[in-house]
Amino acid sequence: MPGVRIRENEPFDLALKKFKKQCEKAGILSEVRKREHYEKPSIKRKKKAIAARKRALKKQRKMMD
């Protein structure tokens, strides 16, 4: 869980920027977007297979160059 300690005389904008960066590193926003709507297990499997296929093609293209 991201958290930011604010020092004396530290502007709020800077603390907010630090907090947003920590949230991004932790992957909270992407997780929230992923869980925003229910996704059927069959759709999850399909997306996972497509992603694996894309990774394999990308790896194959990289090996050819």
Swiss-Prot record:
GO terms for biological process: translation. It comes from the Bacteria. Disulfide bonds: none annotated. Keywords: Ribonucleoprotein, Ribosomal protein. Gene3D superfamilies: Ribosomal protein S8. The keyword Ribosomal protein applies. One of its GO terms (cellular component) is ribonucleoprotein complex. Pfam families: Ribosomal_S21 (PF01165). GO terms for molecular function: structural constituent of ribosome. InterPro entries: Ribosomal_bS21, Ribosomal_bS21_sf. PANTHER family: MITOCHONDRIAL 28S RIBOSOMAL PROTEIN S21, SMALL RIBOSOMAL SUBUNIT PROTEIN BS21. NCBIfam families: S21p. Belongs to the bacterial ribosomal protein bS21 family. This is Small ribosomal subunit protein bS21. It comes from Trichlorobacter lovleyi (strain ATCC BAA-1151 / DSM 17278 / SZ) (Geobacter lovleyi). The gene is rpsU.
